[in-house]
């Protein structure tokens, strides 16, 4: 009888604690976005010292590769497998980080001119910072296939939306709680996670076509509200002729104790004609890297 009574009392205390916790107000959306912004700035600094190995598969339906040559200059390529090192760099004098894909194997063959390309990019960079950033983006997309020029297939791209200086360009709204993210991320399924939708509302959009037409971005983030950690992202860029969707999942890397992208999926649909271009990248072998700098090398700036 005593034991039953103790259990009953303990259960009553637990129920009271649960009720008290439930009564605590949820943080405001602005508070969570502020935490997410601070988290993204910190994550950029952490990822700047880390290299990941990327296994990247791209596929194009037959109707998508007829006509002009692909981005790589090879006509009619329908399937591509890339192995790359992925790292975050900061061009000299720039105020933003740029992700660089250093491809070392294409369809099972080593890249022959890899050293020369890196020499041109980092040892003898352009004197114009913006031009150097553009060179990095173009080099990172060098082996993409399909009749679609794109430099947006980089896993941390969507995180820029949450940077404090960028948030005013977007409208945000909480649209649900954790559930199945469209990409691999076990943490994003937790019920405590917020799903926050966003929509770009200002001109001169973050993503633009090669003809400088705006492509307003929209999508969702899976965010842990107390810490601001981003567990998954969805980025949709769209205009009258094209829709691109890029999803990324994040998990903590135990050896480095930092959240890292573990998977990226992408799909591009053209309004007229071609079937979709799709891709899936998985990330592994995360490791610290060291850069030797002399007076001739454009330094990777760390703050």
Regions found by a protein language model. Name each.
Residues 16-18:
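N-terminal signal peptide c-region/cleavage motif recognized by signal peptidases
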Residues 1-12:
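Bacterial N-terminal signal peptides that target proteins for export
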Residues 23-218, 225-231, 238-245, 252-261, ...:
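Structured extracytoplasmic
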Residues 8, 21-22:
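Residue-level detector of alpha-helix boundaries and kinks
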């Amino acid at each position: 009888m005593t034991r039953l009574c103790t259990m009953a009392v303990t259960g009553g205390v637990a129920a009271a604690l649960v009720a008290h916790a439930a009564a605590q107000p949820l943080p405001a959306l602005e508070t969570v976005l502020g935490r997410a912004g601070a988290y993204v700035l910190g994550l950029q600094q952490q990822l700047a010292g880390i290299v990941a190995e990327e296994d990247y598969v791209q596929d194009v339906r037959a109707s998508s590769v007829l006509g002009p040559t692909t981005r790589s200059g090879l006509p009619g390529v329908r399937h591509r497998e890339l192995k790359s090192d992925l790292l975050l760099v900061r061009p000299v004098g720039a105020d933003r980080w740029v992700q660089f894909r250093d491809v070392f194997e294409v369809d099972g063959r080593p890249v022959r001119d890899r050293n020369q390309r890196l020499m041109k990019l980092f040892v003898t960079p352009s004197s114009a910072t913006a031009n150097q950033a553009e060179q990095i983006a173009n080099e990172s997309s060098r082996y993409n296939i399909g009749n679609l020029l794109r430099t947006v297939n980089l896993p941390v791209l969507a995180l820029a939306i949450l940077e404090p200086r960028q948030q005013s360009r977007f409208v945000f709204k909480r649209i649900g709680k954790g559930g199945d993210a469209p990409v691999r991320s076990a943490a994003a399924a937790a019920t405590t996670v917020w799903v926050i939708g966003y929509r770009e509302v200002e001109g001169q959009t973050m993503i633009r076509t090669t003809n400088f037409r705006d492509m307003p971005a929209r999508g969702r983030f899976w965010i842990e509200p107390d810490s601001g950690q981003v567990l998954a992202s969805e980025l949709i860029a769209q205009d009258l002729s094209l829709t691109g969707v890029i999803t990324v999942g994040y998990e903590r890397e135990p050896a480095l104790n930092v959240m890292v992208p573990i998977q990226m999926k992408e799909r591009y649909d053209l309004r007229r004609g071609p079937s979709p271009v799709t891709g899936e990248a998985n990330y592994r072998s995360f490791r610290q890297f060291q850069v030797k700098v002399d007076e001739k090398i454009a330094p990777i700036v760390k703050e």
